[in-house]
Amino acid sequence: MKLQLIAVGTRMPDWVTRGFEEYQRRFPRDMALELIEIPAGKRGKNADIVRILQKEGEQMLAAIPKGNHIVSLDLPGKNWTTPELATALSKWQLDGRDVSLLVGGPEGLAPACKDAAHQSWCLSALTLPHPLVRIVVAESLYRAWSVNTNHPYHRE
């Protein structure tokens, strides 16, 4: 199974790239974590935010391979504990499909992305900067994998 993190934004600070890559490299080959970056629309004083969000959504949906299980990262989503995420990860593996996790930009996800999602995951009730979300998602998925495989990374 492949995990795809599809996120709005391209030029991330080095600490974000290093943090994400640290967890990305820890995944086994049979559960690779891939990052697909979607260029953020230009935002300015007179920007049409609705149109920008729509275009970002179209690009995100176009990046999802046909048949993937889609998980949106959004506030109204399910707030999983680590064991619950580990259970979800196991179910995704048993389902036999790759998984695409969608992270929006500053205004969140386009309605089309929310509608296309099979599940919605809320990382926190806090507002998190979307660059940091990449690292939190990668670490959380790695921790869930470690729970499922009895790897010593996760300790109760």
Swiss-Prot record:
Domain of life: Bacteria
Signal sequence segment: none
EC category name: transferase
GO cellular component annotations of the record: cytoplasm
Record's keyword terms, sorted: Cytoplasm, Methyltransferase, rRNA processing, S-adenosyl-L-methionine, Transferase
Binding annotation for S-adenosyl-L-methionine: 73, 104, 123-128
EC number: 2.1.1.177
Compartment(s): Cytoplasm
Reactions catalysed: pseudouridine(1915) in 23S rRNA + S-adenosyl-L-methionine = N(3)-methylpseudouridine(1915) in 23S rRNA + S-adenosyl-L-homocysteine + H(+)
GO MF term set: rRNA (pseudouridine-N3-)-methyltransferase activity
InterPro entries membership: Alpha/beta_knot_MTases, RlmH-like, tRNA_m1G_MTases_N
Main location, first listed in the record: cytoplasm
Quaternary structure and partners: Homodimer.
PANTHER family reported in the protein's UniProt record: METHYLTRANSFERASE, RIBOSOMAL RNA LARGE SUBUNIT METHYLTRANSFERASE H
Family to which this protein belongs: Belongs to the RNA methyltransferase RlmH family.
Task performed by this protein: Specifically methylates the pseudouridine at position 1915 (m3Psi1915) in 23S rRNA.
Name this protein carries in UniProt: Ribosomal RNA large subunit methyltransferase H
Species of the source: Shewanella sp. (strain W3-18-1)
